[in-house]
From Swiss-Prot:
One of its GO terms (molecular function) is unfolded protein binding. The keyword Hydrolase does not apply. This is Prefoldin subunit alpha. HAMAP family: PfdA. GO terms for cellular component: cytoplasm; prefoldin complex. It comes from Methanoculleus marisnigri (strain ATCC 35101 / DSM 1498 / JR1). Belongs to the prefoldin alpha subunit family.
Amino acid sequence: MDQADPREIQTLQMYLNEYGQQIELMTQQLSMIEQQRLEGTAAIETLRALQENADGAVLLPIGGGAYLRVKVLDAGHVLVNIGADVSVERATADAVGYLEDRITELEALAKKVAGSVEQLQGQATEISRRLEAAYRGARQAQAGQGGSS
C-alpha cells in the first residue's frame, strides 16, 4: 500500500468497530446460554435428589440468603416452562428428559455461537492488520512529504 486513502482507513475503522460490537453481543449470548445450561443441570440434579429423598423436605431460597425448609407435596410431577411463559405439568422423569433435551440444544447453540465468534475474531484480526498497514502507509507518506518541503 503505497498511498493510504483516508476513506479506506475510516471504512476499515468502522468495520473493526462493528465487528467488535458483534463479538461483544455474541459473547453476552454465550454467557446467557451457559447460565441457562447451568440452571437446567441444577434442576435435573434437584429433581433426582428429590426422588431419592424419603421425607420430601427441601430448602426453598426466599432471598437475602434466607431459606425455608418445606415439604414437597407431589414429587412425582413438575411444572416445566416450555416457552413464552407457558408451563405444563409433567411426570418428574419426563421433566428430566425434557430438561436434558433442552441442555443438549443449548450446548449445540453455544457451539454454533462460539464458532461465529471465532470467525468474527478472525475477520477482525484481518481488518486490524489491514488498518495497521494503512496507518503505516499514511505515516510513510506524511514523512515523505515532510522531507521534500
